[in-house]
Amino acid sequence: MEKYSFESVQELSLRPNVWEEYIGQEKIKKNLKVFIEASKKRKECLDHILFFGPPGLGKTTLSHIIAHEMGCNIKVSAAPMIEKSGDLAAILTNLNEGDILFIDEIHRLSPAIEEILYPAMEDFRLDIIIGSGPAAQTLKIDLAPFTLIGATTRAGMLSNPLRDRFGMSFRLQFYEPKELSAIVICASSKLGRSLSKSGADEIARRSRGTPRIALRLLRRVRDFADVGEYAQDMRNQSEISLECVRYALNELGVNELGFDELDLRYLAILAESRGKAIGLNTIAAAMSEDEATIEDVIEPYLLANGYLERTAKGRVASPKTYELLHIPFLEQKGLF
């Protein structure tokens, strides 16, 4: 059910397995610990959980830690892989009592699949319709009690009936720089490389509040420290220095705010509109990117940090964007 690229395998090796290793999201951790202990005390399955928020904040990692703390198996799937009722039935009927089913991108489940999921979540029962028309029959299959953990970057796209069936719902927040710095230092030791505190702080500052980005940048910094042009200067150093980190991140095109070429291109398009709202489809066409990438990857951090505003008519650059691009609001010229 799970398929990993080489990069994702590396990410798995850096993933915390217990609460003590998991940094950040303190309020969520505190509540989950209570709910897990209560379920274990009553010898019941944990109630169904929904995690939502921007990508890369630890939804999958939290799910694996929950499974570890509950002492149960976790089976991982993604909504696009569950195309037919038979796909979901095969997954659910193979779950043992107390198992966790993690479905990523759960907002992409089709309405037909959702209909099958409702009784499974509420009554641990599958209702399968066999045949069609007047001769159609409903086959009821009892399921072992299980916990469904859904993850999504678009909670607003979940249907109300599905959302209401989750007993717990948590929104993951962007991380503070000090939390990301601690994550990077811990990960660097797992990678077998020592990283200076100032170097970890620099990676954290340019990671857009996102652990996944911080870990990706750390791996690329390590590459530059090992074999890049800066490697020769690293031979007599016991740890990766701040200077090496800055060199690597600058070479990667990640500026001091964590913005790359795609982010700056997006902001430039907004700024060129001279304060007029621009529709998402227009921005996507101008950037040659799909709308989902813009909504899920580019916009969340920019929105959270006040670089744009969403209105009924579209996206509008904030004064902060004009300041970043050094463009006086009333004197905007063509940027391209």
Curated annotation (Swiss-Prot):
Q: Which Pfam families match?
A: AAA_lid_4, RuvB_C, RuvB_N
Q: Fetch the SMART domains from UniProt.
A: AAA (SM00382)
Principal EC category: hydrolase
**Positions of the region Head domain (RuvB-H)?**
256-336
Top-level taxon in the UniProt lineage: Bacteria
Q: Which UniProt keywords are listed?
A: ATP-binding, Cytoplasm, DNA damage, DNA recombination, DNA repair, DNA-binding, Hydrolase, Nucleotide-binding
DNA-binding as a keyword of this entry, yes or no, is yes
Positions contributing to ATP binding: L14, R15, G56, K59, T60, T61, E122, D123, F124, R165, Y175, R212
- Summary of subunit composition and partner proteins: Homohexamer. Forms an RuvA(8)-RuvB(12)-Holliday junction (HJ) complex. HJ DNA is sandwiched between 2 RuvA tetramers; dsDNA enters through RuvA and exits via RuvB. An RuvB hexamer assembles on each DNA strand where it exits the tetramer. Each RuvB hexamer is contacted by two RuvA subunits (via domain III) on 2 adjacent RuvB subunits; this complex drives branch migration. In the full resolvosome a probable DNA-RuvA(4)-RuvB(12)-RuvC(2) complex forms which resolves the HJ.
Question: So what family is this one in?
Answer: Belongs to the RuvB family.
- Task of the protein: The RuvA-RuvB-RuvC complex processes Holliday junction (HJ) DNA during genetic recombination and DNA repair, while the RuvA-RuvB complex plays an important role in the rescue of blocked DNA replication forks via replication fork reversal (RFR). RuvA specifically binds to HJ cruciform DNA, conferring on it an open structure. The RuvB hexamer acts as an ATP-dependent pump, pulling dsDNA into and through the RuvAB complex. RuvB forms 2 homohexamers on either side of HJ DNA bound by 1 or 2 RuvA tetramers; 4 subunits per hexamer contact DNA at a time.
Q: Can you name this protein?
A: Holliday junction branch migration complex subunit RuvB
State the taxonomy lineage: Bacteria, Pseudomonadati, Campylobacterota, Epsilonproteobacteria, Campylobacterales
